[in-house]
Amino acid sequence: MNVPMLDLSEQYEQLKPEIMRVLDEVMRSSRFILGDYVKKLEADIAAYSRAKHGIGCGNGSDAIHIALQAAGVGPGDEVITTAFTFFATAGSIARAGAKPVFVDIDPVTFNIDPAQVEAAVTEKTKAIIPVHLYGQMADMEAIAAIAKRHGLVVIEDAAQAIGAKYNGKCVGELGTAATYSFFPTKNLGAYGDGGMIITNDDELAEKCRVIRVHGSKPKYYHHVLGYNSRLDEMQAAILSVKFPHLDRWTEQRRKHAATYTRLLEEAVGDLVVTPKEVDGRYHVFHQYTIRAPKRDELQAFLKEQGIATMVYYPLPLHLQPVFASLGYKEGQLPEAEKAAKEALSLPMFPELKEEQQQYVVEKIAEFYRHFA
């Protein structure tokens, strides 16, 4: 049996007639940039997130960059973020001209540790970027309290967490703004790149809208240095077809996560550490990520059995060569470094079959019986 990490083909076949219809509508309209589908998606995602504004942009990385610039973050500023996430989070800070300050994670959730955030605040700190990794929100009440005490901006990186909740609060409700990615692998994915900023701050939203179109307002009159980063109409049309299915897909992911946890506990006990949904959180399981001893050997074995897995992420950001000038050393952020050696994400997508999950777990158990 072959089990892919992600299979978008079944989803496409289910939605194909409607996707073809909206794409044809866009083609016939000849309105490809910031058209009606972009406006509709912005309104729908904002309402879904209980936000006043949605600002579509080219991708999730640009969403972070634009939000930072709109919030006034720039050269000389420090932005505190997690060392254990995708590069775009820190790359966007650096692109804004600011200095990323990396802190360690909570080993249970893989998310940023608020106590470490508090300790990292200096007079140069301008913002905090918590990342809601794998689909579970960070401890936003604690982070929001730190931000309030120190007068800081909070930009939530929710690339993996659309639909997640914290004590009933949506992504973005406890921060200054939040950013989404619509990369094809995301829970709500386009057939190309796409991103969005959501916020309840009217001034910030308007600045984001200006920055995404070369900093022009009105057209051809430029008061700030902006970028060309717009969510195109065809991607917005595709996302508008997918969006009504998002909650159902999330429930399927949560069901698959519960199945994995049950099967793994039955098969290998505490040999691997399964994901924990913290009380008060609603985890959307963009990834189902275990901690596995002999992780690399297990991954190689599963590959031989036709099972795809991924390591998110093999090298923490504070040890990335591009950030060597910041002076971080190995051992400085031990939980992030430990996670990078142990984390393994198993196949996860709404259409995943239970027999596929059973096969995955059987092979994990076989590995630990014979090779560990």
Curated annotation (Swiss-Prot):
Residues 53-158 are annotated as: Hydrophobic. Keywords: Cell membrane, DNA-binding, Membrane, Pyridoxal phosphate, Transcription, Transcription regulation, Two-component regulatory system. The keyword tRNA processing does not apply. It comes from the Bacteria. Disulfide bonds: none annotated. One of its GO terms (cellular component) is plasma membrane. It is a peripheral membrane protein. The keyword rRNA-binding does not apply. Residues 160-179 bind DNA. It is found in: Cell membrane. The modification N6-(pyridoxal phosphate)lysine is found at residue 186. Pfam families: DegT_DnrJ_EryC1. InterPro entries: DegT/StrS_aminotransferase, PyrdxlP-dep_Trfase, PyrdxlP-dep_Trfase_major, PyrdxlP-dep_Trfase_small. One of its GO terms (biological process) is polysaccharide biosynthetic process. Gene3D superfamilies: Aspartate Aminotransferase, domain 1 (3.90.1150.10), Type I PLP-dependent aspartate aminotransferase-like (Major domain) (3.40.640.10). GO terms for molecular function: DNA binding; pyridoxal phosphate binding; transaminase activity. Belongs to the DegT/DnrJ/EryC1 family. This membrane protein may function as a sensor protein and may transfer the signal of environmental stimuli to the regulatory region of target genes to activate or repress transcription of the genes. This is Pleiotropic regulatory protein. It comes from Geobacillus stearothermophilus. The gene is degT.
